Swiss-Prot record:
Name of the protein this chain belongs to: tRNA pseudouridine synthase A
Function: Formation of pseudouridine at positions 38, 39 and 40 in the anticodon stem and loop of transfer RNAs.
Species for this entry: Hydrogenovibrio crunogenus (strain DSM 25203 / XCL-2)
Listed HAMAP family: TruA
Positions contributing to substrate binding: 110
InterPro entries found in the cross-reference section: PsdUridine_synth_cat_dom_sf, PsdUridine_synth_TruA, PsdUridine_synth_TruA_a/b_dom, PsdUridine_synth_TruA_C, TruA/RsuA/RluB/E/F_N
Keywords carried by this UniProt record: Isomerase, tRNA processing
Family listed: Belongs to the tRNA pseudouridine synthase TruA family.
Length: 262
């Protein structure tokens, strides 16, 4: 039995998230079907971070066990020929038996992409979130810094979040602009359900000048989801990386690879 890790990118628009669902198509279902065809045996996947309906990924990582012996080309090009055009396997690597895509990860990175101009783009539908009002990115970034470190993120978790507690360690959070695009880049040890989208929805209120910079710090202390901003749309969210101990020697996506032109 061989343990393999794979890198995956996908546009999540057509899928009800990563995880298996009874009544709609998922990224996991498509990948397991394609991998099982190449392996000629049933394949089950475990991933680093389960994404929601409409959320994309450029650096998702998953692992599976197989009795099949195939060259890398079969696990990449062969599997990709069995996948729809909006899902791709980008690399494959044999892993030691103690590796687990989810539990071995020490951090995850997300990027949220906002298209900020009065008129929406005709070609970026479902790939970005449109904001027609001018955004003050400096104020958004300043407010975001109050979320760094280990905190109780109850104000930014979904009502149906099943996590046993709301403590998370946000290690990096930056808001920046490139032309008409505003990027929110965040790294944490783990994330609560809708945590990134709820943070972005809150920062948008600061960027529109509807709320002061200090509001975000106050929300964190209140630990009350009803007091924070609305959940930002799924379309702008990208799972960028899962980070692992260097001993596993896994590829990483460089954030600069996800740049946009306008």
């Amino acid at each position: 039995m061989t343990l393999l890790a794979i890198g995956i990118e996908y546009q999540g628009t057509a899928y009800c998230g990563w995880q298996h669902q009874k009544h709609c198509d998922s990224v996991q279902q498509q990948l397991e079907k394609a991998l099982s065809y190449i392996a000629d045996e049933p394949i089950g996947l475990n991933c680093a971070g389960r994404t929601d309906t409409g959320v994309h990924a450029i650096g998702q990582i998953a692992h599976f066990e197989t009795n099949a012996s195939r060259p890398d080309k079969a696990w990449i090009q062969g599997v990709n020929t069995q996948l729809p055009n909006d899902i791709r396997v980008t690399w494959v690597k044999p892993m030691p038996e103690d590796f687990h895509a989810r539990f071995s990860a020490v951090a995850r990175q997300y990027r949220y992409v906002i298209f900020n101009r009065p008129v929406h783009s005709a070609i970026l539908a479902n790939r970005v979130t449109w904001e027609n009002r001018p955004l003050d990115v400096k104020k958004m970034h300043a407010a975001a810094q109050d979320l760094l470190g280990e905190n109780d993120f109850s104000s930014f978790r979904a009502a149906g979040c099943q996590a046993s507690h709301a403590n998370r360690n946000v290690q990096y959070l930056q808001v920046s602009r490139q032309g008409n695009f505003v990027f929110v880049d965040i790294q944490a040890n783990a994330f609560l359900h809708h945590m990134v989208r709820n943070i972005v929805g809150t920062l948008l209120e600061v960027g529109r000048l509807d709320k002061p910079v200090e509001w975000v710090s106050e929300l964190l202390k209140k630990q009350d989801r009803t007091q924070a901003g609305m959940t930002a749309p799924a379309a702008g969210l990208y799972f960028v990386n899962a980070l692992y101990p260097e001993s596993f020697e896994l590829p990483r996506v460089v954030l600069d690879e996800l740049l946009w032109q306008a």
